């Protein structure tokens, strides 16, 4: 009987090892094919980079699909991971194309913050959350259990970071090797690494191989997870101390002390503090399967939860104060959505606090886990909405600026017509022309003069600092005397 069990164990181990090797080969192959496609797109399809909105979005699609397929890959599943990767990459393709076509760098008359925010932060967060929920569904059931969501939510960043490190070290070694051979007059490999037709597929294969290798490093992933848990338990005390300090400031000096401080964009700082507290709390909470922690850890966690609604409320106050004074802009609309999501997470905090009424419960803050899963889905919808054609940040901002003038809330001489013209594109121009039709406005003459001037100006700078005649150009070109 013992012999039979040992043979069975060996067969299972061999199957697992064979599956891991196969996944590694598949990872390298997927990355290699993705690299070829990216090379072909940029070499033969993109003729003019400034106008190639669809083609650039296609580049992102190929990279996203390959990455998603490798992250979702399972040795016993093929169809579901591929379908999931197609869904994620396809949805992001639509959003990429929308923002790239709107926020093109060649269009100097439109604010590019939405595109910058999407590429630098929002897109990665949407992809991460979508992969987390998709992997959790593949591992368990739909809707996914929070224990699976948390497991994958922690594993994905670790796998990604580890794959980047492996790929970087591999590339450094290979390029150093090629450089060394060059010193011995062996130029073939050095020149080969300069060729794009070789470099893109090669980099893709290295990236795919690195991701597949990291999938199997369960011991490393577990060790890093333990370190992150330990870090969260340490920083929760700092978060609690910061919350207590902020509460003392608010009690003694009121909210005006925060908004009157010499700090730029206080709302951004407050939202950052709220999000940091959220991450630290979830690092302590883990997957929701544990018993309540010791009192020394439980108390600072509760203090951090109490502070979260305070941060989000103050961020809202700071944003609304700016909007009341200066109207909506793409940046402020984005800030409102993020602050709204932070405020919505206060419901999760409240549920966690209420669950503490059962102080001796077997599991800690049971409602938090399912609500975290729901919040992940809401985050995807909110961030995707900002990048979608359904929410036009420039049009909304232009209408808000028109409303400021139409309601006589701002003096026509102090209004920034240049921002509307040169930051809000055609939507700003449309609202500027509507301003000229406000016949009942007491400052209509000033409005019409300013609108005519800004519409005829070639740039924001020349609108703000107009040159009246050619002599000023000549004077500007003359060298300044050393005397």
Model-assigned labels for residue ranges:
Residues 414-483:
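Extracytosolic and intramembrane catalytic regions of membrane-associated proteins
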Residues 124-127, 140-147, 171, 221, ...:
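Low-complexity, intrinsically disordered regions enriched in charged/polar residues
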Residues 2-312, 321-387:
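Hydrophobic/aromatic interaction determinants used to assemble and anchor large protein complexes
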Residues 381-412:
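Hydrophobic alpha-helical transmembrane segments in integral membrane proteins
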């Amino acid at each position: 009987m013992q012999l039979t069990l040992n043979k069975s164990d060996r067969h299972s181990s061999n199957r697992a090892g064979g599956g891991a090797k196969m996944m590694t080969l598949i990872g390298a192959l997927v990355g290699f094919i993705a690299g070829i496609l990216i090379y072909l797109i940029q070499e033969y399809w993109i003729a003019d980079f400034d106008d190639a909105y669809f083609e650039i979005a296609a580049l992102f699609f190929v990279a996203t699909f390959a990455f998603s397929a490798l992250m979702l890959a399972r040795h016993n599943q093929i169809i579901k991971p591929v379908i999931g990767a197609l869904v994620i990459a396809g949805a992001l393709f639509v959003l990429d194309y929308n923002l790239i076509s709107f926020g093109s760098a060649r269009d100097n008359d439109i604010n590019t913050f939405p595109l910058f925010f999407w590429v630098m932060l929002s897109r990665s967060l949407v992809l991460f959350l979508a992969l987390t929920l998709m992997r959790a569904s593949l591992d368990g059931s739909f809707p996914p259990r929070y224990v699976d969501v948390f497991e994958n939510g922690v594993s994905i960043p670790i796998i990604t970071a580890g794959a980047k490190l492996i790929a970087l070290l591999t590339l450094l070694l290979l390029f150093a090797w090629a450089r060394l051979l060059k010193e011995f007059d062996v130029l073939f490999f050095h020149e080969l690494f300069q060729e794009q037709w070789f470099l893109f597929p090669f980099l893709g294969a290295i990236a795919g191989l690195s991701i597949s290798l990291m999938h199997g490093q369960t011991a490393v992933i577990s060790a890093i997870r333990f370190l992150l848990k330990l870090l969260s338990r340490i920083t929760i005390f700092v978060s609690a101390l910061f919350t207590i300090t902020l509460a003392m400031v608010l009690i003694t000096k009121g909210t005006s002390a925060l908004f009157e401080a010499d700090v730029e964009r206080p709302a951004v700082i407050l939202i950052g503090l709220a999000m940091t507290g959220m991450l630290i709390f979830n690092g302590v909470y883990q997957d929701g399967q544990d018993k309540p922690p010791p009192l020394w850890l439980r108390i600072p966690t509760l203090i951090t939860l109490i502070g979260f609604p305070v941060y989000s409320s103050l961020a809202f106050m700071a944003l609304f104060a700016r909007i009341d004074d200066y109207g909506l802009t793409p940046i402020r609309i984005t800030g409102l959505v993020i602050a709204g999501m932070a405020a919505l997470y206060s419901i999760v905090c409240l549920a966690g606090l209420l669950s503490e009424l059962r102080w001796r419960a077997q599991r800690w803050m049971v409602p938090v886990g399912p609500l975290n899963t729901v919040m992940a889905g809401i985050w995807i919808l909110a961030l995707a909405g900002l990048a979608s054609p359904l929410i036009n940040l420039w049009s909304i901002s232009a209408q808000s600026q028109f409303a400021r003038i139409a309601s006589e809330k701002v003096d026509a001489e102090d209004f920034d017509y240049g921002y509307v013209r040169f930051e809000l594109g055609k939507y700003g121009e449309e609202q500027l022309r509507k301003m000229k039709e406000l016949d009942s406005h007491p400052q209509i003459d000033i409005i019409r003069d300013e609108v005519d001037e800004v519409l005829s100006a070639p740039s924001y700078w020349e609108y703000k600092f107009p040159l009246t005649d050619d002599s000023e150009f000549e004077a500007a070109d003359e060298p300044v005397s050393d005397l």
